[in-house]
Amino acid sequence: VLEEQRLDSRIHNCAEFDCGKPELNNYLVRNATQDRRRNISQIYVLVDSDDPATVLGYYTLSAAQVDCDQLSEHDNRHLPRYPILCFRMGRFAVAQNLQGRGIGKTLLGCAVDRCLRIRQEVAAFALIVDAKDTDVKSFYEYFGFVAFADKPLSLYLAIGR
């Protein structure tokens, strides 16, 4: 059974994680625990309950804000003219040997579900992501994310409408 867990370096073997992108691998090993301790971001991993040490994928969440004029005309229409709060998924990675098997979809679903739960306590309009390239952008668009008007590789998903 796949489980989402908060990163715990005493349990999760970050050094063995390889998504094929050195900067995302290195972040998990070198910076993730530090960022969590400093309240810069929270890091969540996807594991198999039979082997919780093996990280199948991870994502980070932090607070963000966005100017409404950057949103699509449809979303912008009923919002205030000042910056609004959002969530930012700063990093998102799936183990290279599992890519294309639905792990990314599961992990993204976990992130959206978590945002919806947090949103019950702290208002936030959307989940923001920054795609590294057009292939990654297409992945997010498939799940309903919309590009910002002025930043085509930055996207958002309005949540909880």
Residue ranges and their predicted role:
Residues 1-34, 38, 54:
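Short amphipathic alpha-helix that is part of the acyltransferase structural core
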Residues 39-63, 70:
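Conserved beta-hairpin
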Residues 51, 55-57, 61, 82, ...:
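Short Lys/Arg-rich amphipathic alpha-helical segments
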Residues 58-91:
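Conserved acyl-donor/pantetheine-binding loop and adjacent beta-alpha core of acyl/acetyltransferases
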Residues 90-100:
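A short, internal acetyl-CoA/4′-phosphopantetheine-binding micro-motif in the GNAT/acyltransferase core
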Residues 100-114:
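Conserved acetyl-CoA-binding loop-helix of GNAT-fold acetyltransferases
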Residues 108, 133-136, 152-159:
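Short glycine/proline-centered loop/turn elements that form peptide/ligand docking sites
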Residues 116-117, 122-124, 130-150:
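Conserved active-site alpha-helix within GNAT-family acetyltransferase domains
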